[in-house]
């Protein structure tokens, strides 16, 4: 079991909408496909991800740094302990090799886009919807989510966390946080 390709394409959102901060008419988004050699129901398993609007596509970072690190890693080093699925945490460690610690906004968009595609592939290999796969993980972890543009209200397993006017923007891969 291994990742055989990571494909990225940058596409325009081309939407005539805008808000108080952003005009989306020239905004782009990255679309990512993490292609594996696993076959389910006669079809190759491919995980898909995209970055949200409000940030531009990050094709350069994905294609020039992160894709290469994933594909150059020893395939077995990216598998879980049972060798039955990909391990998103090990893949994340491989793609972040030689990166300076810290958030660094545009990089987090690229990594989050890949993270989404990796988790999609993991769920497909497991034969489960992603929400079920994540729900099987034991324990709770606090998640910090904030935004500089709006008030954030997050429902976390029947607990509501409210933050009024957070000071910094943090992009976090919730799937990774829940599964640890």
What is the role of each PLM region?
Residues 26-28, 63, 142:
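A short, structural micro-pattern
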Residues 1-59:
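Structured beta-strand/loop patches that form or line metal/cofactor-binding pockets in enzymes
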Residues 139-180:
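Metal-dependent enolase-superfamily TIM-barrel catalytic cores that perform enediolate-based chemistry
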Residues 16-19, 117, 164:
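Short alpha-helical segments and helix-capping/turn motifs at coil-helix boundaries
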Residues 1-8, 19-23, 93-95, 99-102, ...:
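N-terminal amphipathic alpha-helix/helix-capping segment at the start of soluble metabolic enzymes
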Residues 108-132, 139, 146-147, 151-152, ...:
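Conserved structural scaffold segments of CAZyme catalytic domains across common CAZy folds
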């Amino acid at each position: 079991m291994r990742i055989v390709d990571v494909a990225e394409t940058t596409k325009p959102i081309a939407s005539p909408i805008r808000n108080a901060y952003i005009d989306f008419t020239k905004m782009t988004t990255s679309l990512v496909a993490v292609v594996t050699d696993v076959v389910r129901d006669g079809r190759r398993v491919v995980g898909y991800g995209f970055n949200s609007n409000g940030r531009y596509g990050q094709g350069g970072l994905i294609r020039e740094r992160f894709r290469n690190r994933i594909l150059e890693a020893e395939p077995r080093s990216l598998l879980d302990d049972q060798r039955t699925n990909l391990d998103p945490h090990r893949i994340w460690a491989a793609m972040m090799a030689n990166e300076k610690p810290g958030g660094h906004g545009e990089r987090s968009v690229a990594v989050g886009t890949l993270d989404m595609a990796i988790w999609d592939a993991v769920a497909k290999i497991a034969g489960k919807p992603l929400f079920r796969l994540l729900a099987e993980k034991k324990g709770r972890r606090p998640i910090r989510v904030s935004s500089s543009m709006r008030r954030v209200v997050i429902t976390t397993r029947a607990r509501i966390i409210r933050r009024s006017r957070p000071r910094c923007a943090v992009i976090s891969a919730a799937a990774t946080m829940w599964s640890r």
